Amino acid sequence: MKHLSDAVFFVCLSICALFSLTLCDGEICQVGNMAIPVGKEQPDPKGCAKYECLSQSNRVLIKKVTCASQALKRGCKSVPGPAGKRFPECCPTTLCRGKQWGQ
């Protein structure tokens, strides 16, 4: 009898886990003209960022990831990323006197 109750519990637990995994299956995040499936990401065509479509606690969420702002130290400068590159290659870099500047 103990084995039967353990088996029933395991089957119920497996069904619940499968249901929670497929609950957002097929869901899409809409960002402007972009449709991003849950679990996927796409670069922002208009800027240096990317969007991620996520499923969390039975909710569909959109996460926007952008370049971080940098506090420049003395002797350093911010260099813009190359135009036309996708995130994160489009983010600015920091160059400081010394090795990077060849001095």
From Swiss-Prot:
Pro-peptide positions on chain: 98-103
Keywords: Amidation, Disulfide bond, Secreted, Signal
InterPro entries from the UniProt entry: SVWC_dom
UniProt signal peptide: 1-24
Species, as recorded: Urodacus yaschenkoi
Name under which the protein is recorded: La1-like protein 15
Arginine amide PTM positions: 97
Primary localization: secreted
PTM note: Contains 4 disulfide bonds.
Pfam families referenced in this protein's UniProt entry, alphabetically: SVWC (PF15430)
